[in-house]
């Protein structure tokens, strides 16, 4: 995983079937010198075709689209282009929908009512730190944890985490950045990123949201 420079220009693509909404997002981000809109699509199929030629850093992805929706498109992006961050941008604010999208790999989730500042912050944060949590995602994930029974597939019983891995996982759940965690545990940011990837493999999770859910289920952090 790359250790991004905070002054890099972030390449962004958007997939949404409403042209007016796409234009609004592009306009709201046009004044940001560190954001470059590189592609737009009206459905998931068109987006995947574009990604064969253009590699954005971040994708803003709608859920409800014709031909190929966001729910189908997200896992394809994560499988084919694992380095691309995906922010779901939708009218849905249903907790079960949000937690599902985060579990299968979304790096964040915003409603379409989110202001331009929130969208910009989410883009910057997922680019630099891999994930962006807000009140909506936090409530959705905790709601999902309270209603979903722990299963062997969601929390493997034979997982053995080292003390260092547990410490780093707890710090991630406190929303510490990679650099902050590296300073606390006295490791390089690259090593912290490698441990984070190893944690995903060990716990059978695909995203930071999945790691948070695992940590709560395993009793490593408390639900608030």
Model-identified regions with their sequence ranges:
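Helix-turn-helix DNA-binding segment
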Residues: 154-191
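Active-site residues of response regulator receiver
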Residues: 62, 90
């Amino acid at each position: 995983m790359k250790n991004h420079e905070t002054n890099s220009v972030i390449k962004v693509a958007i997939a949404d079937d409403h042209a007016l909404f796409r234009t609004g997002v592009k306009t709201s981000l046009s004044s940001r010198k560190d954001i470059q809109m590189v592609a737009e699509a009206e459905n998931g199929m068109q987006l995947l075709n574009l990604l064969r030629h253009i590699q954005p850093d971040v994708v803003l992805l709608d859920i409800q689209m014709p031909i190929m929706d966001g729910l189908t498109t997200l896992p394809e992006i994560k499988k084919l282009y694992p380095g691309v961050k995906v922010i779901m941008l939708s009218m849905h604010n249903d907790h079960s929908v949000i937690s599902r999208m985060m579990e299968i790999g979304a790096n964040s989730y915003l409603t379409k009512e989110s202001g331009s500042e929130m969208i910009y912050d989410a883009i910057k944060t997922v680019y630099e730190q891999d994930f962006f949590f807000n009140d909506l995602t936090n409530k959705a994930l905790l709601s999902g944890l309270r209603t979903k029974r722990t299963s062997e597939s969601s929390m493997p019983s034979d997982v053995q985490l080292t003390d260092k891995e547990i410490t780093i996982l707890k710090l991630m759940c406190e929303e510490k950045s990679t650099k902050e965690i590296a300073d606390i545990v006295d490791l390089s940011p690259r090593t912290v990123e490698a441990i984070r990837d190893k944690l995903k493999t060990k716990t059978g999770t695909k995203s930071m949201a999945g790691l948070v859910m695992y940590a709560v289920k395993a009793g490593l952090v408390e639900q608030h």
